Amino acid sequence: MSQYLVAIYRSDDYDPSVETEAMMEEIHALNREMIAAGARKLACGLSPAGNAKSLRKQPDGKLLVTDGPYTETKEHIGGFWILEAADLDEALAWARKGAIACRAPVEVREILFRPAPTQEPGGSK
């Protein structure tokens, strides 16, 4: 089984408070369906992109911390799922349901690297 990121995109000026009760129930129902199928590993909603902080290493080795997202675009990731699926087609089937429930575009990407279960963060054992 492979794991996939399903990223939900929102406009730069998206206000999470406008989400309707019906939309939230559809998202909760989809999450329950994903859990029952053993597909959902993690689900998260993110604060608006304007709340982000970005860090960039400078030529002198110091880190520059700036307000706002790393890239300046009209859409940003507003939330995501980490799913386990047999293949890309299965991940896309879940992503279709996510796009409908969230009423937003989604992007699907396979996760290429996962630490081994015994591996500590940072790569040491």
Protein language model regions, located:
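Conserved, structured core segments of small domains
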Residues: 1-125
